[in-house]
Amino acid sequence: RFRSKTVRLFYLGTLSYSYDVETVCKGVRKLLDDGENVELHVMGGGPDLEKLKQYENRAIKFYGYLPYSEMMSIAKACDIAVNAIHSHAMQSVTNKLSDYMALQKPILNSQTNAEVLDLMNLLPHENYRSGDVDGFVQAAKNILKRKNDSVQSDEIVRRFRRDVAYQKIVNLIERLAHE
C-alpha cells in the first residue's frame, strides 16, 4: 500500500480527553525537524479531532472514522503503533492495544499500569511519559533502531486471537450454566 523508506507510525481509536495524541503530533513534527523520515497516520475520531487537525501536514494524516477492515489494512502497512494514553486515564488493556498486539507491530507506549507493561515485553517497544514531547522523540528514535527486533508471536496469538479467546469465554459460560 505504501512505498519508500519512510517509517510510518499509526494510532487507532478515539481522539479525546483520555488519549494523548497531541504529544504524538508534536513529537512527529520534532522528528521531521530532526531529519527523520517518518509519517503519522491517525485513524479514528472524537471530540479532539478538530483541535488535532492543526498538526496535519504532508507527514501527519488524519483519516477520521474508517470501517474496521480498512483501518486494519492501513495499520498493517505501517511500521510502529502508538499507544498514547494520558497518565490520568483509567484504561487498562484497551481494544486499541489488543489490535496493536494482534498486528504484532513495535509499540511506542505511554501507559504505565503493570498489566500493559507486562504485555509490552512480548514485542519491541519503547515507553515514554504522556505529555513529554522530548521523551516521545527519544523513545521514537530508540524504537526506529529496534523495530525489527523479535516478537513473541506464539504468546501474542495465544493471548489475543479473538476467536480463541471468545471460544474460551463461551465454554466458561456454558460450563457455569450447567453447574
Where would I find each of the regions flagged by the language model?
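Nucleotide-sugar-dependent
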Residues: 19, 67-73, 81-101, 108-118
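Glycosyltransferase donor-binding loop in the core domain
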Residues: 13-19, 92, 128, 157, ...
